């Protein structure tokens, strides 16, 4: 266990167009090789496409709802007890919940074949908004794993 103080959380400024810290964190996750202006362009264009497909007046609220639908509530953590490793279901912390949802959305958007990141991201956000698609399947699989290993819940730490 480290004797040093805990690392301070870095405060991220809100994005310039929508004024949302969550959206700025999402842009940072989309960003590759430090190219933030490209990441911003991709995310903003994807949000416009997403808003048109969903028919939402407030883009930010629709984005937040799509993100909320993708957030996992439970996950499994490996715990070694007496030579055996158990998959112990635990609740996901709020920060990690956001982080996982964003990572999954971006991962599956990049995996869409023959489409630009802009189109893939918009499609994945629409799927999350409608509670379907690869991201929601990943969330359900995570919940299913936690449910299947409920017997080991008493090993929580």
UniProtKB/Swiss-Prot annotation:
Xref: SUPFAM superfamilies: Ribosomal protein S7
Cellular component terms per the entry's GO annotation: small ribosomal subunit
Gene3D superfamilies (alphabetical): Ribosomal protein S7 domain
Biological process annotations from GO: translation
Molecular function per GO: rRNA binding; structural constituent of ribosome; tRNA binding
Keywords, comma-separated and alphabetical: Ribonucleoprotein, Ribosomal protein, RNA-binding, rRNA-binding, tRNA-binding
Keyword S-adenosyl-L-methionine: no
Disulfide bonds: none
InterPro entries linked: Ribosomal_uS7, Ribosomal_uS7_bac/org-type, Ribosomal_uS7_CS, Ribosomal_uS7_dom, Ribosomal_uS7_dom_sf
Pfam families xref list: Ribosomal_S7
Similarity field: Belongs to the universal ribosomal protein uS7 family.
Described function: One of the primary rRNA binding proteins, it binds directly to 16S rRNA where it nucleates assembly of the head domain of the 30S subunit. Is located at the subunit interface close to the decoding center, probably blocks exit of the E-site tRNA.
UniProt xrefs under HAMAP family: Ribosomal_uS7_B
Subunit: Part of the 30S ribosomal subunit. Contacts proteins S9 and S11.
Name of this protein: Small ribosomal subunit protein uS7
């Amino acid at each position: 266990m480290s004797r040093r103080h805990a690392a301070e959380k870095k405060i991220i400024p809100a994005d310039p167009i929508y004024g949302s810290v969550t959206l700025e964190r999402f842009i940072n996750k989309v960003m590759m090789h430090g190219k933030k202006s490209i990441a911003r362009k991709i995310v903003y264009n994807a949000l416009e496409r997403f808003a048109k497909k969903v028919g939402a007046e407030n883009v930010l609220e629709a984005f937040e709802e799509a993100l909320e639908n993708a957030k996992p509530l439970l996950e499994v953590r490996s715990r070694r007890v007496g030579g055996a490793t158990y998959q112990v279901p635990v609740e996901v912390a709020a920060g990690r919940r956001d982080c996982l949802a964003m990572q999954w959305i971006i991962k599956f958007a990049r995996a869409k074949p023959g489409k630009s990141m802009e189109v893939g991201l918009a499609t994945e956000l629409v799927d999350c908004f409608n509670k379907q698609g690869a991201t929601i399947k990943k969330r359900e699989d995570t919940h299913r794993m936690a449910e299947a290993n409920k017997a080991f819940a008493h090993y929580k730490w």
